[in-house]
Every structure is written in structure tokens, then in C-alpha cells.
Amino acid sequence: MANSYREMLYWFGKTIDRNLPYVNTNGWRKQKGRKDGICLNCLDECKLYSCDHCGIKHKCGNCVLSECFLDVKNEFNKYRWLVFDEEPDQAVLLQHWIMYKDYFLQKFNYRLATQAKILNMNKNQKFQLNEGRKRALSVPITSQFLKFRLFGKIYIQFGTIMTNKIQPWLELSTLKIGYLQLLNVERCSELMATRGQFTTNVAKTACITEIKCRRPIYDNDCIIEAYLDKNDRGWKFAAILGRRKIPVTQKLAMEYFMKSLRAELFYYAHSRCHTLSNCPRWNEGLRLLNSSTLNIVFRRQFMNEIVEWFEIFSQYTGSHYEFITECVHDKSAITAFKQEIEDYIKEGKQITLKSVVPEEHAAYRHILRLRESLMLAIDAALSRIRSQSMGVL
């Protein structure tokens, strides 16, 4: 069975416009042979074939006639495939994603006769639609994107990536999967599903920020479900572990917040270690990155600003060191840094960063901005935790 994004493309082309986005609309051919990556047109894991336009293997057997991402002409692909000369910021990406989302919902309209069947859950509990169409109709409009550098340009592709096999022809250090927001709340608000038997509101994401290490990436790293509660008549969010739905309370959220902070401190401390060093960050047996689903849900819900802060902080401090192959973890400095953060959370004591950025450090000129931005990021996370009046994320 194809993933929901590919099924969406199939029904998009079959019921709306056969040239949009120009894939095989006579039924998907059954994939045979070894799967070695994802097709950049349908984003499904499959055996890849060479593109007639560029010669790169980036198309599956069902999409051999589709456009090449290096030569975009049709309207749909212009919205979902972007190219930039320089690294785009989040504001630019958000503007493009809004245009992509608006165009998608205008064309793949859930109010049309075919799509509307999914909304009539109360009158049609048996829901007699074939599985492929159900998957197509349930595709989430996530703000997930695939980003890579090729021929000196930055390529952004919006879509739902649900596999750990990305592209064999790309250097992994140039590849990133990112998110502009967590859930497709706008579309969820239109759905009238009152029972969880058909999970139209599931956003399944591999939760990868950047692939630079040897950590195995698991297909089911993160599953998040938004659902309407019949009793409270409001939205609730839960992490899915097997068949269990796990709501996250305020108390647990605070525990995960402290745990996540400690993890960020750990990875900052080892941010300049080489993959071949004896640093525990690269030790397969430790598997610190193989976090629980609940931890990943929390990280995405509350930790975005703090994670971004540590990424920038690592760049500021790491860019002023020679590239080395030894572990540079400084236990005393990180312990002092950790204590500063805990004192700020518990007592409101200002963070100085003196333990990790001494005055002679080249990054010290950014010290005021770094201090203020870290405290603001922590404040934002704490305010979200304390505002959970429903008791769940």
C-alpha cells in the first residue's frame, strides 16, 4: 500500500486534473525489487529510476513521466517545489507554505462530493470507501519539508515524508527535514469526525531535524493524533504508542521539560565532537537520540525555540575552534551552565553564560543577545506548559 501522500497525488490527478501533477492515474504499479530511496514526486519509498531530464535517479516507476524538480512547469509543482540561491529564513518558508496550503485546499477540496464522504461519519459509520481513497482523503496538510543543496542552490520540497530512506545520491550532511508547525489545525477544524475509528487527523512524522550522525532513524519515531472529545466538545492531543493514546499532563510536561533541557545541554557539550571519536554522543549503544514518542511529542510542542537556540549557540561557539577529532566535553562548565538554567527556572536568577562563553571568547560579542534569547525561549516554553488548562498537550 502506498503512503497517504502518494494516494492523494493519485486521486488528485484522477478526479481533478490528469496533468496535475502528472503521475500514473491508471492505478499504481506494484513495486518490485529493492527500495533504495524516495521518489521526489510522490515521496514514497521505492526503487528509483533515472530522470530523462537530469539523469539523477529520483523517480519511481509510477512517476517516470512526471516533471523533474530541476525543470518545473506545472502550477502544482511550482507551489510545492521551491528553489533558492541562499538559505531561506522561516518567514519566507512560511509565506510559501501558506500559498502551497491554500492552493492545495482550493484544488483538493474536502467539500466536493468525493471528498465530502469522509466528513459524513455520523450518518455513515461503516464508511464504504476503498482503502486507497481513504488514505488519500486523510493526507495531512503538514508543514513538513525536505531541504537539500544541489548545484549550489537550496531546494525545498513540501510534502509528507514517512520513510527513513531518503536519497542515495545526496550527501547526508546536506539534507534536512524540517517543520513550520506541528499539526494541521486549520484543516482539522473542518473535519466533523467524532470517533477515533478512522484517524483522519493523524500526522505521522519521522521527527528528524538533521541527519549528521550514525543513529538509526526509525519509521515510527513519532505519531501524533488530534481528536475531538465528545464529552468535553473540544480538541485533545495524544501521543500514540501502539494501541494506546497517552495524554500528557502539566506535571509530566514539566518533567519532560527538564529532561529535554538536560538532553540539549548534553548535545551542546558534544556538538564539536568528531564521529570517529570516543565521545558517547556517537556511541550506538547509548541511543540517546532514540527517545520515546512522548518525549518527541513534548519536544515538538514546547521546545522548538530552545532547540533552535542551542543550534545557533553551537554555531556561534563552535565556529571559533579548529576542527578536532577528540571529545571536548567540559563537565565543570556544563554543570555550571545547567545550574544557571535551573536557578533561572526556579528563582528567576538571570543567566550569565560565563561558564561557557568567557570574555576572551570570540563569541562574547553576542553575549547579551544570547543571554536574552535563551531566557525568552525558556519563558515561552514555561508559559505554554502552565497554560494547559485541559490537562493535556
From Swiss-Prot:
The keyword RNA-binding applies. Residues 39-77 are annotated as: Zinc-binding domain. Interacts (via C-terminus) with host IRF3; this interaction leads to IRF3 degradation. Interacts with host IRF7; this interaction leads to IRF7 degradation. Interacts with host CUL1 and CUL3. GO terms for biological process: symbiont-mediated suppression of host cytoplasmic pattern recognition receptor signaling pathway via inhibition of IRF3 activity; symbiont-mediated suppression of host cytoplasmic pattern recognition receptor signaling pathway via inhibition of IRF7 activity. One of its GO terms (cellular component) is host cell cytoplasm. Keywords: Host cytoplasm, Host cytoskeleton, Host-virus interaction, Inhibition of host innate immune response by virus, Inhibition of host IRF3 by virus, Inhibition of host IRF7 by virus, Inhibition of host RLR pathway by virus, Interferon antiviral system evasion, Metal-binding, RNA-binding, Viral immunoevasion. The integrity of the zinc-binding domain in NSP1 is important for degradation of host IRF3. Belongs to the rotavirus NSP1 family. It comes from the Viruses. Residues 267-393 are annotated as: Interaction with host IRF3. Residues 80-170 are annotated as: Important for cytoskeleton localization. One of its GO terms (molecular function) is RNA binding. This is Non-structural protein 1. Residues 2-79 are annotated as: RNA-binding. It is found in: Host cytoplasm, Host cytoskeleton. Plays a role in the inhibition of host innate immunity by inducing the degradation of key host factors required to activate interferon production such as IRF3, IRF5 or IRF7. Associates with components of cullin RING ligases (CRLs) including CUL1 or CUL3, which are essential multisubunit ubiquitination complexes, to modulate their activities.
